[in-house]
Amino acid sequence: MAVYTDVSDDDLTTFLEGYDIGRLRACKGIAEGVENSNFLLVTDRGPHILTLYEKRVNPDDLPFFLGLLRHLAARDIPCPQPVAGRDGAVLHTLCDRPAAIVTFLDGVWPKRPEVRHCAQLGEALARLHLAGGDYAPTRRNSLSVDGWRPLFDAAAERADSVKPGLRAELETELDALEALWPHDLPTGIIHADLFPDNVFFVDDTLSGLIDFYFACDDFLAYDLAVCLNAWCFEGEREFNVTKARHMLTRYEKVRPLSDAEFAALPLLARGAAMRFLLTRLYDWLNTPPGAMVRPKDPMEYYHKLAFHRAVSGPGAYGLSR
């Protein structure tokens, strides 16, 4: 979460007149994140989150995202619920931006995830995948394998300024991923960005999943691969197989992986690492000095990609068949 658009008191007051959430007591910008402008609203009925959707979010996708939150919340997935205005709509306009209010979730995200966090994350992810199974709207994953080549092309000319030889390495890896990428794994709704800062815990118990604005239809096991990258490394290079084992084991207690999904884990993990390497590389090269959000180091995912390329098989992630 972050703040890119300032909202005046008058504009906010007028906007909130369209809702029945109580009298506003305080409004505070939330600094974390990279995509949208977010504010904590405190009223005499409790806290809510106000989001203004910035230019990187396609307004046409917002009904999909907000509808998904409603769908998942109705199936006991701990995620924010969109709040309807007095007109019955959940999407409105504030400061020339699409805007929505969602319920507030208690909890904090784990700065240093431990095994118990990874285990609960695995179970929650499997429950999310099952709960999304009957969500009718669809959204293509624009950041899957078909989207990596355009990202690479946009960054290729300056890639070697980040690491000498990076351009050639990435092109070789892209060629391999495009040739090997599977086509017939189980698909469904995935979160696609379930990093630790998007998962809340209260007293070490998982309490919420947030930031569904990359959610889409794709391979369910790809979502697991994203989480293996985001949760199971100590630093940039040391893979913690114990964390991975607990994550995957708890996932499989709810939704067992098919043999094909299990066999594809190393390839999917390579792809997930490539996805975040490329988006970080693009942002690293194109974020101007003095920008409010500091770009994340793409080399973290270069090292993670190297790990996945070197594994001997899916057993490297702690499970065996």
UniProtKB/Swiss-Prot annotation:
Pathway: Amino-acid biosynthesis; L-threonine biosynthesis; L-threonine from L-aspartate: step 4/5. Keywords: Amino-acid biosynthesis, ATP-binding, Kinase, Nucleotide-binding, Threonine biosynthesis, Transferase. GO terms for biological process: threonine biosynthetic process. It is an enzyme of class 2 (transferase). GO terms for molecular function: ATP binding; homoserine kinase activity. The keyword Methyltransferase does not apply. InterPro entries: Aminoglycoside_PTrfase, Homoserine_kinase_II, Kinase-like_dom_sf, Pseudomonas-type_ThrB. PANTHER family: AMINOGLYCOSIDE PHOSPHOTRANSFERASE DOMAIN-CONTAINING PROTEIN, AMINOGLYCOSIDE PHOSPHOTRANSFERASE DOMAIN-CONTAINING PROTEIN-RELATED. NCBIfam families: PRK05231.1 (NF003558), thrB_alt (TIGR00938). This is Homoserine kinase. The gene is thrB.
